[in-house]
Amino acid sequence: MLELKSISKKYGVTRALKDVSLTLPQGQIVGLFGENGAGKTTLMKCILGLLSHGGTITLDGASINEKNIERLSFATCEHSFFPALSPKGHRDFYQAHFPRFNDKRFHALMDFFELPMNKPLRAFSAGMKNQFEVVMALSQGADYILMDEPFAGNDVFNREDF
């Protein structure tokens, strides 16, 4: 279970999050909705340990750390991959660093989205980059998959594929 208790975050004097508490059981699909600037991305970055914050975040009762972070994956429209690497290069990197990486799922999703294996990511369109973010998040073998606007930049047909 992913549990957030009284999460708060400020950027200078601007309060991005105030006393946010959530309990997310494994396997549940949850959507966060809010206006631009409401703190959705900030909350996800706090969960992943990318931002300091007030309050506590635990995964099955333990603080998120280097021992359990592999149980979380993240897909973002900010494109968090290495632009010079191809999907094949990313797969090789992830296989080396994420023991639970699912190569069969990776290939099935690459085929589903018809993404090229050997083209550098910097040559992908915005929509293709978003698809690849989702491929990597779903292939990592994580128990919890966080997605931050994974459909941004995709046309309506690609959104239906997702």
Predicted regions and their residues:
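ABC-family P-loop ATPase nucleotide-binding domains
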Residues: 76-132
